[in-house]
Amino acid sequence: MTEQVFPTAAFSALGYESVHHGQGQWNGVAIISKVGIDDVVMGFADGDEPDPEARLIWATCGGVRVASVYVPNGRSLDDDHYQYKLAWLERLRRVLDTTYDPAQPLAICGDYNIAPDDRDVWDPADFVDATHVSQPERDALRRLQDWGLVDVFRRRYDEGELFSWWDYRGGSFHKRKGMRIDLILATESLAARSTADLIDRNARKGKLPSDHAPVLGDFSEAT
């Protein structure tokens, strides 16, 4: 959504600060906080050409550097958008290398449009030659993690079929045909403070829900 229609006033009435980077009906990311929002950066801000799509926003909230991401979908392996997706992820890794320190408390949260491994899809056989599970995508995600990021949900839960996304079509939610593509990746100093992680399936059961379920993470305050 555009900045003009983002519900800033509604969040403010509930005691939240918010910042939003949107692009019409197609793309958008936001950060909403009760512990302050400082040092906001929209996009990569790396000195190169701006990203043509609104997919990344950074802010510091309560001493934690937070990024909200909406990683490109990729569409299909032979689509230009797939190459854009891989380049986008590599660009994010370069920003981490040049701007941030893996020792600092930092989290990159959002829709990654990648299932990290085969536990995170309902049937790997259904995804042969498909996006979201291709090896280049998973390698790009692993490169982000190799910088110093922990998948906090997967650290706590090892089993499969813990999905955050289900297609609207064909009753996929009720058939448990989903994927886990919404992630909280945190540096170790923050991941060590993780106290609870949850995918809220109940939010997916309502009338006219999103095709994604919220992924929640609780962290203790720094001592």
Locations of regions flagged by a protein language model:
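Structured beta-strand-rich core segments of catalytic domains in phosphoester-bond hydrolases
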Residues: 1-76
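Active-site environment of divalent metal-dependent phosphoester hydrolases
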Residues: 1-5, 77, 115-116, 160, ...
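Metal-dependent phosphoesterases centered on the DNase I-like endonuclease/exonuclease/phosphatase
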Residues: 10-15, 88-181
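Conserved beta strand-loop-helix elements of the APE1-like EEP
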Residues: 25-40, 160, 172-193, 219
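Short hydrophobic/aromatic beta-strand or adjacent loop that forms the aromatic wall/cage
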Residues: 27-29, 53-58, 178-182, 210-216
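Acidic carboxylate-rich catalytic motifs and surrounding loops in phosphoryl-/glycosyl-chemistry enzymes
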Residues: 44-45, 151-160, 197-201
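Surface-exposed cleft-lining segments at the edges of enzyme active sites
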Residues: 45-47, 71-89, 125-129
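Surface polyanion/phosphate-binding segment centered on an Asp-His-Pro turn
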Residues: 198-223
